[in-house]
From Swiss-Prot:
It comes from Neisseria meningitidis serogroup C / serotype 2a (strain ATCC 700532 / DSM 15464 / FAM18). GO terms for cellular component: cytoplasm. HAMAP family: Endoribonucl_YbeY. Its EC number is 3.1.-.-. GO terms for biological process: rRNA processing. This is Endoribonuclease YbeY. Single strand-specific metallo-endoribonuclease involved in late-stage 70S ribosome quality control and in maturation of the 3' terminus of the 16S rRNA. Keywords: Cytoplasm, Endonuclease, Hydrolase, Metal-binding, Nuclease, Ribosome biogenesis, rRNA processing, Zinc.
Amino acid sequence: MKRTKKYPFLTLQRQRFHLNFENASSAAGIPAERDFYRWAWSALKNEYRRADISLILLDEEEARAYNRDYRGKDYATNVLSFALNEGEILPCQVSEKLYGDLIICPQVVLKEAAEQGKTPERHFAHLTIHGVLHLMGYDHIEDDEAEIMEAEEIRLMLAAGFPNPYQEDEY
């Protein structure tokens, strides 16, 4: 395996984690693929040794179609998560391999970041982590589940060098 000097941590982790990244969005100001990789891996690394995730950036029209078809909501949302084992309750074990798809709509993310006074990078990081946590079985429908998921999001964002994602700030 060829090693990269610029991002050596990616070479080591690629043996365990594969991110199939596709940018099918026309939006400007999207972080680099390596950033999405780093954010996704930060959420996975303590609970999964192996993972295969597709992360696709789609424009609003396509994101809206997925949200309508799979959630019955006729609008573009920031992130959608599709776990291979969705609907099954599986304990997170280090030996499992996680499979799933994430769809992120950059136009929605950029709009929300501006409205919430967050940098785009911070909001993309948060929603990538948020989506991966959904793939891992976290949810926020019930209040007690939301507390657990939000606490994990805050922990991971702080570890990645970002502030609490649930606090607004000016940039």
